[in-house]
């Protein structure tokens, strides 16, 4: 009897954990903040905008929420002449986090030469960021980072719309 009771409790916990994993995300939001970056050459003032953008189906219903981070260098006279880098890793499984926090972003993980975290843990200025020469958008494909499909009326979205080279081109273009 004790084993059955424990099994029932374990099952109930699993159901609750599954419910905790399903979250409702707003489909169109932004948050903007201002920052400074010390590079090897100069101090760069920049704006960071993170947000989500809806992906629409053929009849105009939102079917996914696409997460992005957008960095723009401040005090640029003609933004139309400034290069824009759009960076994303392939999903599912890996969002743009490694491009963002390991290579081109204005802040990088505090790690040693072999890639192990060093104290104090966290992030530090990236003196090699490309923000001095180009604005950057990091995009998380659907089911990576905070990008998710949006089930409508209890029905799951057709996942074939998001997984594959041609699918990525279709919904990201």
Positions of predicted regions on the chain:
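Bacterial Sec-dependent N-terminal signal peptides
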Residues: 1-22
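Short hydrophobic "helix-edge" motifs at membrane interfaces and signal-peptide entry regions
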Residues: 6, 30-32, 130-131
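Conformational gate/switch positions in structured elements
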Residues: 12, 42-43, 141
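Catalytic-loop region of hydrolases
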Residues: 20-84, 102
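N-terminal cap/lid subdomain of alpha/beta-hydrolase-fold enzymes
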Residues: 60-163
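Conserved acidic catalytic loop of the alpha/beta-hydrolase fold
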Residues: 155, 170-173
């Amino acid at each position: 009897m004790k084993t059955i009771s424990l099994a029932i409790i374990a099952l109930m916990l699993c159901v609750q954990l599954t419910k905790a994993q399903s979250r409702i995300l707003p489909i169109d939001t932004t948050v903007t903040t201002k920052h400074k970056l010390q590079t090897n050459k100069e101090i760069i003032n920049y704006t960071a905008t993170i947000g989500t953008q809806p992906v629409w189906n053929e009849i105009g219903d939102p079917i996914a929420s696409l997460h992005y981070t957008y960095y723009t260098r401040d005090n640029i006279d003609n933004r139309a002449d400034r290069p824009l880098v759009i960076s994303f890793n392939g999903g599912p499984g890996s969002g743009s986090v490694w491009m963002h926090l390991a290579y081109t972003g204005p802040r990088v993980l505090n790690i040693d030469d072999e890639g192990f975290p060093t104290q104090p843990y966290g992030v530090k200025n990236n003196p090699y960021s490309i923000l001095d020469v180009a604005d950057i958008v990091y995009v998380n494909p659907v089911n990576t980072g905070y990008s998710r499909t949006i089930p409508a009326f209890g029905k799951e979205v057709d996942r074939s719309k998001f997984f594959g080279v041609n699918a990525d081109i279709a919904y990201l273009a």
